[in-house]
Amino acid sequence: MGRRRIDDTSHPDQSLTNEFWLRFSDNPQPPMREKIIYLTMDAVAERGPANFNSAEVCDRLGITHPMVNHYFDNRDGLLAVTAFVVYDRHIRSLWDAVAKAPADPVKRLKAWMWQQVSSTDVMGGWGAVLNYPHTSLTVTSIMNAQFRDEINELFEWNLACLAILVSDVKKGIVSPLPAQIDPELRSELGGQSDIVALVSSVAWSALGVAVWNTGQHLASAQVPEVIDQREALIEAHIDHVVNTL
């Protein structure tokens, strides 16, 4: 395969149009490194990390296979970088959903929980990497080594904002959400043991139903009544969690 011109935006896969790339960002022709990440996002979401073939991504883009090593060191490095991008987008999508919800404490919390379900569903096979790290130890080790600080920051910010949502439901108010967590906020929220317990319960509950919905639980996936009522069951579960606060 000959060397590509730097201004060559064509690819052997004709489906990789400007419109395709706009699914991922506002750039209709992102840099090649980002294109590799975006195709990896799709491939792992669809087939899971074990069946991911980085050579297929390169072939779709019309680049040589060693380009993965050039940008990411190796296949696992590519998966680690992409896993962080997926996690970052997942967390931010939760709060985009809250921002779009009506200014009502219950509706904002429900928006967060529903987005947890929806985003985890879109995440697909990435759930195995992010929720069950032992299934991809090398990938998660690289991810932790490269992005541990950023992951911790996102995790703490997500829980801090969720604590505010939960507290708002109990008080019947709507509070502004911080753009980032600082030591003062961390200390303030950490001192409210009752809220911390409720936040943990809400977060675990939302993740549980999200993983169940995405994973197509082997036993219940074959029960027609469960399939037909899936959305209603999730809605009832979310209502129950919120009503118990």
Language-model regions, residue ranges each:
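Short, structured helix-loop boundary elements
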Residues: 33-34, 54, 76, 106, ...
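N-terminal intrinsically disordered/low-complexity leader segments
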Residues: 1-31
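Hydrophobic/aromatic residues within well-ordered alpha-helical segments
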Residues: 32, 75, 82, 86, ...
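Solvent-exposed, amphipathic alpha-helical segments
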Residues: 35, 39-47, 89, 93-100, ...
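Helix-turn-helix
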Residues: 32-35, 39, 43-77, 81
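Amphipathic alpha-helical packing segments from all-alpha helical-bundle domains
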Residues: 91-96, 107, 128-132, 137-200, ...
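Amphipathic alpha-helical linker/stalk segments
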Residues: 20-25, 82-111
